[in-house]
Amino acid sequence: MSDFWHKLGCCVVEKPQPKKKRKRIDRSMIGEPMNFVHLTHVGSGDMGAGDGLPMAGTVQQQMRSKCGRDRQWSNSRVL
């Protein structure tokens, strides 16, 4: 009887799921931006001296003044 279960176990094997092929996106599928709000420009004058990073306080202050909200902008990605 154990031989039967051994042979049955060899036949019942979990097969790997085939990878789903992602649909390719072309330019005709992409439309104009919706609900776009332009807050500010960040140019070379807004960059920190020598470090190549924007001065966070200045950029955040510009964004607050442009959108008219008193929202506290954070540096984290979690909103």
Swiss-Prot record:
Residue ranges of every copy of the CRIB domain listed in the record: 30-43
Keyword Membrane tagged: yes
Protein name per the record: CDC42 small effector protein 1-A
Topology within the bilayer: Lipid-anchor
Example of a GO biological process term: regulation of Rho protein signal transduction
Subcellular location: Cytoplasm, Cytoskeleton; Cell membrane
InterPro entries assigned to the protein according to its UniProt record, in alphabetical order: CRIB_dom, CRIB_dom_sf, SPEC
Top-level taxon of origin: Eukaryota
Lipid-binding residues (covalent, S-palmitoyl cysteine): 10-11
Family: Belongs to the CDC42SE/SPEC family.
Entry keyword Cytoplasm: yes
Keywords: Cell membrane, Cell shape, Cytoplasm, Cytoskeleton, Lipoprotein, Membrane, Palmitate
Lineage: Eukaryota, Metazoa, Chordata, Craniata, Vertebrata
Entry GO MF terms: small GTPase binding
Alphabetized PANTHER family for the sequence: CDC42 SMALL EFFECTOR PROTEIN 1, CDC42 SMALL EFFECTOR PROTEIN HOMOLOG
Cellular component per GO, a single term: cytoskeleton
Job description of the protein: Probably involved in the organization of the actin cytoskeleton by acting downstream of CDC42, inducing actin filament assembly.
Pfam families attached to this UniProt entry: PBD (PF00786)
Main location group: cytoplasm
